[in-house]
């Protein structure tokens, strides 16, 4: 009888701790992911305002909240389509990982899908209308996503170790 109660107590205590840790981890990870999307969308809005180009700021006066190096760190490309969805031009000058042909292929795939925002692999994309048709803009989010996934893995590993530690402590204390 006592062994049965002891077992139930250990299971309930460890389950409660696991539930709380999973809830906390879930909230933190969701907030982190939303921040990645928000930052990417802000950068993309700035690029859209400048017709798919990174704006030039006055010397020594970067945009508030932006590093003067952001212009050189931001990897993006844009493809311009006419109203019937045919490619007019592509700007791949700010990315080395994607050739112009690939950029056009990605843009046509997104344009045909009818979606305005989302991810295509590690690229956050946005479709905006222009006077000639549409601009499909892609922003490389690989660094941010890589950090997010490493944080997620580390969080789960630490949580698993923590839950196991609580299990051992509760198990030992329940025998007294």
Language-model regions, residue ranges each:
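Cytosolic-side ends of inner-membrane transmembrane helices, especially those
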Residues: 25-33, 158, 162-176
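Extracytoplasmic
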Residues: 96-156
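Extracytoplasmic ligand-binding sensor domains of the Cache superfamily
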Residues: 62-117
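N-terminal membrane-entry
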Residues: 11, 145-169
């Amino acid at each position: 009888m006592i062994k049965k109660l002891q077992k139930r107590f250990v299971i309930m205590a460890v389950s409660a701790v696991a539930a709380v840790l999973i809830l906390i981890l879930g909230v933190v990870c969701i907030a982190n992911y939303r921040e990645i999307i928000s930052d990417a969308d802000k950068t993309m809005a700035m690029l859209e305002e400048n017709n798919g180009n990174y704006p030039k700021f006055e010397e020594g006066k970067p945009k508030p909240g932006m590093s003067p190096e952001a212009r050189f760190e931001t990897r993006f490309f844009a493809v311009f389509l006419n109203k019937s969805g045919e490619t007019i031009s592509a700007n791949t000058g700010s990315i080395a990982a994607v050739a112009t042909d690939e950029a056009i292929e990605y843009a046509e795939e997104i344009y045909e899908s009818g979606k305005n925002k989302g991810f295509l692999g590690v690229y956050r994309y946005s479709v905006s209308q222009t006077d000639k048709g549409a601009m499909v803009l892609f922003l490389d989010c690989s660094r941010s996503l890589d950090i997010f996934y490493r944080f997620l893995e580390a969080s789960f590993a630490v949580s698993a170790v923590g839950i196991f530690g609580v299990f051992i402590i509760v198990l030992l204390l329940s025998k007294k």
